[in-house]
């Protein structure tokens, strides 16, 4: 009798995706991040579902419903902080996953890559709307500032902003629709993840060397299932350490003050994972220019397959490109730091220089480094 996992219409899909999947024998721990992102999404959907059972999306009761979850619901504090810090872990894994793709040239699978960039946008949109829901000061003012950016769009901007708000300011209608979108988007993300994996399994995984590995493949199970379990344990350890020892480490104290449209916080800033984009936005004195720079700071990832001029896929054997890559990483850390600082000297000029460097490295320096390396290798 043939094994059911190879014949059953549903089980064989799982079999071809997670069990008998031919996988390169040399993929490193950087390839664990995909499964960790899947785990993060599962954690966020589950904790979010339980939070939604107790949350009310009304301006009068939203803040107190979150307080009620933390104080009165059994382990409500745990669910709430797992959800809040789970978002941070999600973004850490996302940034590492994207960085891995850039370093090892995984972006040459451009369908997989482009679906991944769309996923990044979807996760960022979901996280932004989720941050508005507790209806604290930073929730309200963050929502006001970021949605207001759309008014920079010529001709339709103001109408568009009021349409999104459902009125003339961020109010009850805005909160209700943000809750609806925040609830539904993770399921759309889950569907996009399936598409992402579908495209990936058409080509098979890349590997650190960037060479074709068809002649040396091993089954995903048990080798990489065991390896992924180690990653899962480390992720859960990190998340639970954060949740149980310093749950508010990555949050903003202003969000423990209920939203007040009449009192602006001294420094409006988003969660840490948006600070690099926020710094790029603020570094341009023009509103529309800033919004375009903000969008292109992420959208530029879609250009990587076009900007790949090297004869080698991976950066593993390209020291010059490696150097530029790590300067880009350092630049992103600088932008993240600047995004959390007030708009004053010397932070303004540092932010502007870091923003220019970000786009320059990606658009000119990395492709130039690739051409130099090709020349040095006489290719």
From Swiss-Prot:
Transmembrane segments: 33-53, 77-98, 113-133, 178-198, 226-246, 288-308, 320-340, 347-367
Chief place where the protein resides: mitochondrion
GO cellular component annotations of the record: mitochondrial inner membrane; respiratory chain complex III
Compartments (UniProt record): Mitochondrion inner membrane
InterPro entries the record matches: Cyt_b/b6_C (IPR005798), Cyt_b/b6_C_sf (IPR036150), Cyt_b/b6_N (IPR005797), Cytb/b6-like_sf (IPR027387), Cytochrome_b (IPR030689), Cytochrome_b_C_euk/bac (IPR048260), Cytochrome_b_N_euk/bac (IPR048259), Di-haem_cyt_TM (IPR016174)
Binding site for heme b b562: 83, 182
UniProt record similarity statement: Belongs to the cytochrome b family.
Subunit organization: The cytochrome bc1 complex contains 11 subunits: 3 respiratory subunits (MT-CYB, CYC1 and UQCRFS1), 2 core proteins (UQCRC1 and UQCRC2) and 6 low-molecular weight proteins (UQCRH/QCR6, UQCRB/QCR7, UQCRQ/QCR8, UQCR10/QCR9, UQCR11/QCR10 and a cleavage product of UQCRFS1). This cytochrome bc1 complex then forms a dimer.
PANTHER family named among the record's database cross-references: CYTOCHROME B (PTHR19271:SF16)
UniProt-recorded name of the protein: Cytochrome b
Native source organism of the sequence: Poliocitellus franklinii
Organism classification: Eukaryota, Metazoa, Chordata, Craniata, Vertebrata
Gene giving rise to this polypeptide: MT-CYB
